A protein has these predicted regions:
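Soluble FAD-dependent oxygen oxidases
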Residues: 1-265
Length: 265
């Protein structure tokens, strides 16, 4: 479903109403992007429901009642869930070869409508200031966490099990002279979201991390056991390319995150 940016407050309110009572059958992804065909700033909502179409239409009726400017409702088998096209998913991606992307992420535990509204306006200003970077997107992912919370936190290495929302901006840099300014916007986004996240410190899903550090990705409480496992199974720190658990200062200084294996002898 595609919505005008002016519908943002209504969308945030629906998301807040769902809150922590999100059915386990429901998965929501909001993507704020720029699309000239639809008047510039848009909000796409990719809503999935595991179950009958009739249940899905009832569950997503609050979104449909807002009269999206574009919508596509389909029923697909499990085998096609990742390959099926998503409305509004065209354009550049952080995973495209040769793409220069600056990603900034935050875990959220509460939904602050004022913070989301301010961030939307800042993104509109960003698109105006950096028209060559209008392939950039802001993503908000909301999944049911009832099953995640059913596992005790100290039983696994997976941190931040009570996360309500995963959000990030993927800022596309198509003009090298704008690196600093675009990264400054990303840092501002991360600070704004973290301040309204529901916790006093920054927490980031490890796969979305950049340079925040291992305590932010894995949590301080889990690091002692993780480092013990690292010393046992990877004492040479060979598997340390991306957001690793570090066990030596020397390796921390020498690791090259730009190319897998470039520092291996």
């Amino acid at each position: 479903m595609r919505f005008h940016s002016r519908d943002n407050t209504s969308l945030w309110e629906i998301m807040k109403d769902i809150g922590s009572n999100q059915p386990r059958e429901m998965a929501l992804t909001f993507q704020v992007n720029w699309n000239d065909e639809f008047g510039g700033l848009n909000i796409n909502v990719n809503a999935k429901w595991v179950g009958p179409m009739e249940e899905a239409l009832i569950a997503f009726s609050p979104f449909l009642s807002l009269n999206p400017i574009q919508r596509s409702i389909t029923q697909i088998p499990w085998t096609s869930i990742y390959s099926s096209p998503v409305l509004g998913s065209g354009g550049s991606s952080s995973c495209d070869r040769g793409t220069k992307s600056s990603n900034w992420a935050v875990n959220l535990y509460t939904i602050s409508i004022p913070a989301l509204t301010r961030t939307l306006q800042k993104l509109a200003d960003f698109y105006s200031a950096f028209p060559s970077s209008r392939t950039s997107v802001w993503s908000i992912e909301k999944f049911a966490n009832s099953v995640t919370l059913s596992t005790q936190d100290d039983e696994t290495a997976y941190p931040w099990r009570n996360t309500t929302i995963y959000t990030f901006v993927a800022l596309q840099i198509n003009d090298d002279s704008q690196d600093d300014a675009i990264n400054a916007f990303g840092a501002s986004f991360q600070a704004e979201m973290a301040a309204s996240s529901g916790y006093g410190d920054l927490r980031v899903y490890m796969n979305y991390g950049r340079d925040e550090g291992e305590e932010v990705w894995y949590s301080e409480g889990k690091l002692p056991r993780l480092k013990a496992l690292k010393r046992k199974y990877d004492p040479m720190e060979l598997f340390s390319h991306y957001n690793p658990v570090m066990i030596s200062e020397q390796h921390k200084k020498s690791v090259n995150h730009g190319r897998l294996g470039s520092d291996l002898k």
